[in-house]
Amino acid sequence: MIKSTVVYRDDGLPLCSSVDDDISDLSLNEQKKRIKMVVSRMTPQSANEATLESKDSEIHYIRQQGVIYFVICEAGYPRNLAFSYLNDVAVEFQHSYSNELSKPTIRPYAFASFDTFLQRTKKAYSDKKVQDNLDQLNQELVGVKQIMSKNIEDLLYRGDSLEKMDDMSNSLKISSKKYRKSAQKINFDLLISQYAPIVMVAFFFVFLFWWVFLR
């Protein structure tokens, strides 16, 4: 289950965050504090994607074009699905705001309206069909280590550096090519889940217009 999404600029400025977080989840604020600490310690040499493990949750992140996208998930939520979600978020965020990201006048959480997309995408990634397809993909890739893992306690409190994960990221890039085609199918299923109702409504009105005025 996806619990929360946070987007930072790589200089530490928070850009947006999901707003439907479970207020009864006492650990969520602690996880967000840890994300803030991770952002403050990142350098240009730090890994561009990784998983940070912490108790009953996992924090996944990707860094693209000066922006860092974090998602907090329940432990055991499929990592491939979490990273596919992050990539979808990154593509849409860059498409929507790329011309504004470098402006020095941007205020914290300036793109709060992006939450609408976050909620729609989060719902799509809860679709059972998508998760089933991912399980099948994982079975085909048994033995392939795809995402780096790092205990967040080691990372934040024992002095380990994010730069140490950089070598592992190179092997990640190589192995990721092996499942790209299967991931594309998953993304197609996500699009169907998100937009099929809209297409059906539009088709109904087109048919109604044809029936009334053109038939």
UniProtKB/Swiss-Prot annotation:
Residues 6-118 form the Longin domain. Its main location: membrane. CDD domains: Longin, R-SNARE_SEC22. Keywords: Coiled coil, Endoplasmic reticulum, ER-Golgi transport, Golgi apparatus, Membrane, Protein transport, Transmembrane, Transmembrane helix, Transport. It is a single-pass type IV membrane protein. Residues 133-193 form the v-SNARE coiled-coil homology domain. Residues 1-193 are cytoplasmic. One of its GO terms (cellular component) is Golgi membrane. Residues 215 are vesicular. The chain crosses the membrane at residues 194-214. GO terms for biological process: endoplasmic reticulum to Golgi vesicle-mediated transport; intracellular protein transport; retrograde vesicle-mediated transport, Golgi to endoplasmic reticulum; vesicle fusion with Golgi apparatus. GO terms for molecular function: SNAP receptor activity. It is found in: Membrane; Endoplasmic reticulum membrane; Golgi apparatus membrane. Required for transport from the ER to the Golgi complex. Belongs to the synaptobrevin family. This is Protein transport protein SEC22. It comes from Candida glabrata (strain ATCC 2001 / BCRC 20586 / JCM 3761 / NBRC 0622 / NRRL Y-65 / CBS 138) (Yeast). The lineage of its organism: Eukaryota, Fungi, Dikarya, Ascomycota, Saccharomycotina.
